[in-house]
Amino acid sequence: MFFKFMNYKKWLTKNTRTLSGKTVAISGSTGGIGKELCKFFCSLSADIILIDRNKARSDALKESLLEEFPNISLKAYYVDLENISAVRELAKALQNETIDYLVLNAGAYKIPRRKGENGFENAFNINFVSPYILADALLPKIKARGGKLIAVGSIAHNYSKIDVNDVDFATRKAPSKIYGNAKRYLMYSLWSLDEYRDTVNVAHPGIAVTNITSHYPKLIYAIIKYPMKIIFMNPKKASLSILYALFTETKKNEWIGPRIFDVWGLPRKKTLKTCSQEEAEKISELSKEIYLK
């Protein structure tokens, strides 16, 4: 198993296909996993639309990709996912693009906390509300083109259940629960869209050493950084589950992630039993209300 995983290029040949003539839009493209996904997409001849907050980093990535893959078409949009009004404007703009695949990869873990214009905390807006807005706007066209929307979930979704009296976990202190709550909303709200069952896939990278794992205090991070690199996957290998989601079908409540304890190895499909039908229906109901705020 381990040996096979190290030869992931063979896995790529077997489990992916050309994306020539297709366009992939990806949020959070400048992060560790985002960059690797962009390289994979370009190597499969896809055209790319980058969706990022930091213009300088996005432009640098764009330049790097075009240098390595000069024949692709590449556009960039800049938006802060905390800014709900800006995200709604972006959603309108993207409806004028031809998009076959949308990868909702952007996320934020431990960040300075503040309320957004819709009354919800920024981590909730970044990890759930903004991706949901983009999904709502683009799913009809993606479905019509026979494409896929890939929502990047997290094993953190299982750290707690939703609280209807504290939707965005504003009273909680643990970043893992705040982040996990938002991912729980994202995953189960999209799974509830039965008319898009064949269009929506949820995938997760397991645990990888990226910017999202650098939230620990500097001293602790300095100590654990290198052991983490040995124990967990690098961004390139962690991104394979998300890449695979473009090319496979899943059932409701089935996600794609590393096969060994959900943190290591080649991608596999797994049915989640982490949310009751009653809670899933409540997430669907609340998601529609949140979207309108």
Q: At which residue positions do the language-model features occur?
A:
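Generic recognition of well-ordered alpha-helical segments
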Residues: 192, 241-244, 286
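Short, flexible, mixed-charge acidic loops at enzyme active sites
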Residues: 162-167, 215-219, 257-262
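A structural signal for well-ordered alpha-helical scaffolds and beta->alpha junctions
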Residues: 131, 183-186, 235-238, 280, ...
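C-terminal tail/cap regions
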Residues: 2-4, 220-221, 250-293
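A glycine/serine/threonine-rich, flexible loop-to-helix segment
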Residues: 209-226
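Rossmann-fold NAD(P)H-dependent dehydrogenase/reductase core
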Residues: 2-214, 290-293
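C-terminal helical subdomain
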Residues: 87, 226-267, 277
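Residue-level preference for long, well-ordered alpha-helices that form the structural scaffold
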Residues: 120, 127, 178, 182, ...
